[in-house]
Amino acid sequence: MLNFVVSLTTNDNDYQQEQASAAEATGKRLGVGIQVIHADNDAFKQSDQLLKIVQAPGFRPDGIIFEPVGTALPQVAKAAAAAGIGWVILNREAEYIPELRRMGTAPSFAVSSNHLEIGRIQGLQMAALLPKGGNVIYIQGPSDNPAAKQRTMGMQQTKPVNVKITSLKGQWTEESAYKAMASWVRLPTSQRQMVDMVSAQDDSMALGARRAVEEADPAVRDKWLAAPFTGCDGLPKTGQEDVRKGILAATVVVPPNTTTAIEMLVDAISNGKKPLEMALTVPSSFPTLTKLQK
């Protein structure tokens, strides 16, 4: 029986929770032992956790699948390859993957959501919801996070020129976006600004921003709550359900990529199939862009 460790950034985020659930379900379906661990958004903790697993004198997993909090941990990756442990990175490109693939027989590759396309869809949602343009509060993930950077880049490619962006920073959690939005709302200059839409790079941050507006001064609250709020991840029981309830105007559905990662790693180890260096999952708008334009 194969055994994989799945290291995720946090358990305080519905997408990461779905990543964990999808990993466990896929492991059960394929007869693979899955151990899910969380780094609590701490890059040093994640590095230490994985290095201890790689260097453990007794049991070692057949593969490690991880979504980096900070860097892609090149030294830990090399140690894993040297120990014959498969290495899969989620939602990140890593320059060392080709070198890792040359080092030994253990498979190594990356599986990512198409973050540039996710951003493009968010820009198109802005166009659909704001046909006359307007001011958008855009809540991004961490400044040093490549997924956040790519989503922003994609959004800038497709948003209309008459849509003006004000960016705030979050940490992929509801509470971080709540604090960022609450601080911004209290600024006198912000209270005078017209807000036509609030868009966040994940659904939990969109909900945090909405909660901050709901708790704001009544004059601000009533004005801004009329604006559409949009997010990203689009899980069936959370993001999509919030759209159906009218809490969010739209989301971007991002399939969990732990499923693809585990399937590819099993195929590589059990059947000797050489995996692609990078596999991308395909996002989509919910509701569709056509429905949003009506």
Predicted regions and their residues:
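Extracytoplasmic "Venus flytrap"
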Residues: 1-22, 26-30, 34-50, 67-71, ...
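Hydrophobic alpha-helical
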Residues: 66-85, 155, 166, 170-241
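Short, solvent-exposed amphipathic alpha-helices that sit
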Residues: 15-30, 118-122, 146-163, 176-180, ...
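Short acidic/histidine-rich motifs immediately flanking catalytic phosphotransfer sites
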Residues: 50-64, 190-196
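Hinge/cleft segment of the Venus flytrap/periplasmic-binding protein
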Residues: 2, 139, 158-159, 253-294
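Flexible loop/hinge segments that line or gate small-molecule binding clefts
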Residues: 76-117, 236-241
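Hydrophobic alpha-helical segments within soluble ligand-binding/sensing domains
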Residues: 46, 109-136, 177, 181, ...
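Short beta-strand elements in bilobed, periplasmic/extracellular small-molecule ligand-binding domains
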Residues: 28-43, 135-138, 159-178, 225-226
